[in-house]
Amino acid sequence: MANSSLLRVVLVALLLLGSVTVSAGDGRGTPIAFQAEVSKMLDILVNSLYTNRAVFLRELISNGSDALDKIRVLYLTSPKEPLTKDGEAPTMDLRISFDKEKSELILRDGGVGMTKEELAKHLGSLGTSGTKHFLEKLQEGVGAVGGDQNNLIGQFGVGFYSVFLVGDRVRVASKSDDSDEQYVWESKGDGQYFLYPDPRGNTLGRGTEITIELKPDAEQFLSAETIKKTIHQYSEFINFPIYVQEEVEVASTAATPESAAEERSLDEGAVEEDPDKEGDTQGVVKEKRWTLVNENRPIWTRPIGNVTEEEYHKFYKAFSGDYRDPLYFNHFKVEGEVDFDSILFVPTTVDPASFSDDNAVPNTNIKLYVRRVFITDEFRDLLPRYLNFVKGIVDSNDLPLNVSREVLQESRILRVIKKKLVRKTLSMFADIAAQDEAIANGKQVENPAPSGHTHLKKPAYTKFWELYGKHLRLGVMLDSNNRNRLTKLFRYKSSRSESEYISLQTYVDRMKKGQKGIYYLSGDSVARIKKSPVLEDAVNHDVEVIFMTDAIDEYVVSQLTDFAGKKLINLAKEGVQFEESDARQRVVDRKRKEKYDSFFTHLRALFGYSEVRKVILTKRMTNEAFIVSSSENQITARLASIMRGQSMSLANQQLTAERVLEVNYRHPLVDEMFKRFTVDEDDEVATDIAWVLYDTANLQAEFPVADVAAYSKRINRLLRSSVDLSADDSLLPPDDAEYTVSDTETEEEEEQPKVDTNAHEEAETDGEGDL
């Protein structure tokens, strides 16, 4: 906001102080002085608006494009054919050349040009916009041409002065159709300028030529490669061709008059002879050649439906640097509160950086343009973090060109664009999911025209979900406004669909009559979830269960409590019951609880009151004796395990979920324990069985086992007991005496080098893979 406030103060001051005083002179080189305050304001303005010096080129190219747009519009109603003094016609393009000996960078356009008065008005007074006045003329009916005026890039009077970031001296030669003479505006940015007829005469025919005498620390801009790189970054999609003059080495050949004429042409690839060129001993000479830089046209400005899929793919590769085709794309135009064009792409591979949780790192995948001029790609939230894998461009006519990124960040217009972008992005995903489902169901997918969307020829949403499902689930936690849209995009495997993903809506559509909610179970893999004892109960009741296999799912369900009016129910939590009890059954359940109360109190005391929150009779239809579940309103064992693994803090390392022990009274081992308990509470066998069943149930539920060594010893005791071995039975004595070894075998063994048998076997095993 500081830059925004400064800009307003500066512009107001310029309006008050922007008058100029013309010194006496003959009008051909007499300096024209700004007031001292204006000179100071110029310095503040340049240094506060522009932190990257390379933007001067963006500004000058934008101005040149603006001038070309103006003449194109004017010539629609009043065409003219101006010529230079040498009889050459100006071209509808921008050209950049160099004079390395003089450290000069030269930019030339064939645009509308300026008269002497316009040079003084637009360049001799800060804050004046030539484009603004041009639009005023159009609105007054001078050369009205409909919507074309919206293509003009504005605020010439401010952007031009960024040239003094790199230039010690600037000369602007300009020729307008409204003037017979070509004039030069010249300044060092020191509070004064010169305005005089160009002594070279009419060298332009029409247009403007800017010659920048570069500062010593800005001579990198004498490099064609640097200029081309800057053009690609900022001005790739300007409407008019941009040529850069380069020196190339070519074989020395005798030129014919015809070839010489071709070299003098201004078409792309035309060559200008360097009068100082010298051939080497190999017959090679250096020539200057015009190279077209902005070959990629702004396809987003074309009508949606008139761009082929191949063109979208080619454009994506050009602007993103990715050699692969995108997975999806969406080309759309938004009109209303804010107007903008956009094309969004989904890459076919995941960038690991997209999982970074560093909010300070900007997302550079979305490039912001204003009237086809690149402004920035360093927004932290043009798309939210969970959509930072999406690449694309946004081009708006409603944003100002010459403001800082910081000011844009606070722009109301930009906030509207952000909201629209998120909705359009999620809409793209939903469209692809719908196409994918239609294909899977054998339906014909229609591609409405005009489209601009990816048209699927085969199912592709599964790949998208496997690549970016984690990002969408993150969105549920970060973006409550779009939570419902996001959950419709979720896909999971289930107990009825182990090989294919289904949506939550598909699950709801095929729920059993009277089913309470959406049942799910999380785990490291489908294979592990299938072995869960709590899944057995659901399968026995013919209830479908969603399989959640990503760690982030545990966090998601803490935010996503329901879908389509159906509650999400975790099978790993206590109290899961698929059948309602009638009155008689409730009485039976109450009496059964009374029967086992003292036994359950004993078990809780045995395992520890601090570890087991309560012991209950399970209502699950299962073959397991014990099931350890999580308390209904607390975190699950899996989430606690994930949090311990993700955090280095002592508190989280000790984090555990509350345990509820569910006991299956119908299991034979439980029945045996109960009988022994009624006789002797301290029965050793019953105690060992209880501990082994409890620790095993903990492992199945992903709860940690407190004492693994004790667990191992109890299993050992139970195994001994099962084969009638006493706990006191010790190891057998060595059986060496059973083996007969002759003296000869001993002598032969002594003669052999000592070999590590185990190492030898490992080496043989390692070598098997090479056969």
Curated annotation (Swiss-Prot):
List of residues binding ATP: N63, D109, F160
Q: What is its main location?
A: endoplasmic reticulum
**ATP-binding listed as a keyword:** yes
Induction, as annotated: Not induced by stress conditions such as heat, glucose deprivation or treatment with the glycosylation inhibitor tunicamycin.
A GO MF annotation of the entry reads: ATP hydrolysis activity
**Where does it live in the cell?**
Endoplasmic reticulum
Q: What happens when the gene is disrupted?
A: Defective lipophosphoglycan synthesis and reduced levels of the surface glycoproteins gp46 and gp63.
Q: Tell me the keywords, alphabetical order.
A: ATP-binding, Chaperone, Endoplasmic reticulum, Glycoprotein, Heparin-binding, Nucleotide-binding, Signal
Q: InterPro entries per the record?
A: HATPase_C_sf (IPR036890), HSP90_C (IPR037196), Hsp90_fam (IPR001404), Hsp90_N (IPR020575), Ribosomal_Su5_D2-typ_SF (IPR020568)
For the motif Prevents secretion from ER, give the residue ranges.
768-771
Carbohydrate attachment residues: N63, N306, N402
The residues the entry assigns to the signal sequence are: 1-24
Region: Disordered; residue ranges are 254-282, 727-771
Entry keyword Plastid: no
Give the positions of the site Important for ATP hydrolysis.
R405
Return the Basic and acidic residues bias intervals: 752-762
The lineage's top-level taxon is: Eukaryota
**Role:** Molecular chaperone that functions in the processing and transport of secreted proteins. Required for the synthesis of lipophosphoglycan (LPG), a cell surface glycoconjugate. Necessary for the attachment of the galactosyl residue to the mannose within the phosphoglycan repeats of the nascent LPG chain. Also required for addition of phosphoglycan to acid phosphatase. Not required for normal growth. Has ATPase activity. Binds heparin with micromolar affinity which may facilitate infection of host cells.
Which HAMAP family has this protein been placed in?
A: HSP90 (MF_00505)
Q: Which family does it belong to?
A: Belongs to the heat shock protein 90 family.
> What protein am I looking at?
Endoplasmin homolog
**Organism from which the protein derives:** Leishmania donovani
